Amino acid sequence: MEPKQRVVKPLKERVLPVVKNTQFVWFSGQVIVLISSVLYALQAIPFRSAPPFLFKSAAFGAIVAYAIVLYKTYSPNLTSRASWNKHFFARLMLDDNVQYFILALSMLIDRPILFSLAPYAIYATFHISTYLRSVLLPAIYPNISDAKTASYASRVSNLLNQYTRSQFQPAMQLVASLETFLLFRLFFGVFLRKNSISRLVGYIFFLRMRYTNSHFTRASIKAVSLRMDRLVADNRVPPVIKNAWHTFKTYVSKFGASPVGTAQSRPTASSSTTAPSST
């Protein structure tokens, strides 16, 4: 008796359910983040000017992607007011996805700053890679007897998996360094009138949460702080800058030492490569 051959659905029937899923909207948001960030950087870095809509587009893509993750995570709590307690709000405050969602909202409103897009773009490369490997490739190239197709899909999947595994930790270190750099960019931007002090304060709150959740951020802040101490110690630095730096450092140190709760029940972090669950 001949083995029964597996019936493979047409490509449209395989892909259409994927496109209709909210995961695909999340994926589309990540693609918008990556493409818009790259296009903005390609113009802003060499020419020091780029269309603001590219920056806003990247921020919008991030808002869409993180909004879906937050809805998937917290929608059961939203339907029951009994769950709106201090533990729920502490969980919200410590959730990386909430922090990046709020930061993206502020980026949509505020003046563009080039490097503020970089962490979102780096995260997007891993999110896109994981989604392609776990969702899109299996839909486009199902496990059929066509050796060439299976081999091609397998090679692409292996490359994506290898990229995720080998580059994840270095990428998180880079993200932490960029986010720490942005803190000092905003600090000096207040003196140069390139950004408001309210934006700096808001970002300090964001980085305070990152300091709690990420050992990469803690290591980065410590390293950059030591470098800044050496730079400010130079006799050529005006006393007003030295005093401002020491005051700022003291304030941030006290703020960073204040308790913000525990991260025991925190949901999946934004830096995770896991896509939101399907519906």
UniProtKB/Swiss-Prot annotation:
Its main location: Golgi. The chain crosses the membrane at residues 25-45, 50-70, 100-122, 172-192. It is found in: Golgi apparatus membrane; Endoplasmic reticulum membrane; Nucleus membrane. Residues 260-279 are annotated as: Disordered. The keyword ATP-binding does not apply. Belongs to the PER33/POM33 family. Glycans are attached at N77, N143. The gene is tts1. Interacts with RTN1 and YOP1. It comes from Schizosaccharomyces pombe (strain 972 / ATCC 24843). PANTHER family: TRANSMEMBRANE PROTEIN 33. Required for the correct positioning of the cellular division plane by delimiting the actomyosin ring assembly at the cell equator. This is Tetra-spanning protein 1. Keywords: Cell cycle, Cell division, Endoplasmic reticulum, Glycoprotein, Golgi apparatus, Membrane, Nucleus, Transmembrane, Transmembrane helix. One of its GO terms (biological process) is mitotic spindle pole body insertion into the nuclear envelope.
